[in-house]
Amino acid sequence: MAKKDQLTLRGPLYGNNRSHSKTITRRKWNVNLQPCKVKTADGKTTRILVSTRTLRTLKKHNRLS
């Protein structure tokens, strides 16, 4: 399974590590994915992986089951 948010499709970010000696190495920041249960349109609940930012938004709009 890809490390992506299943609702917003937010994926990892890429950048550089910079050491004290100014050496550059590539690195990846993964999204903080958390499992949660969401109500679908037909009233059923589905378990999905969402980022913590999306989880906050779902809690704000009462979309969690």
From Swiss-Prot:
Keywords: Ribonucleoprotein, Ribosomal protein. One of its GO terms (biological process) is translation. Residues 1-21 are annotated as: Disordered. GO terms for molecular function: structural constituent of ribosome. One of its GO terms (cellular component) is ribosome. InterPro entries: Bacterial_rp_bL28, Ribosomal_bL28, Ribosomal_bL28/bL31-like_sf, Ribosomal_bL28_bact-type, Ribosomal_bL28_sf. The keyword Ribosomal protein applies. It holds the Pfam family Ribosomal_L28. Belongs to the bacterial ribosomal protein bL28 family. This is Large ribosomal subunit protein bL28. It comes from Mycoplasma pneumoniae (strain ATCC 29342 / M129 / Subtype 1).
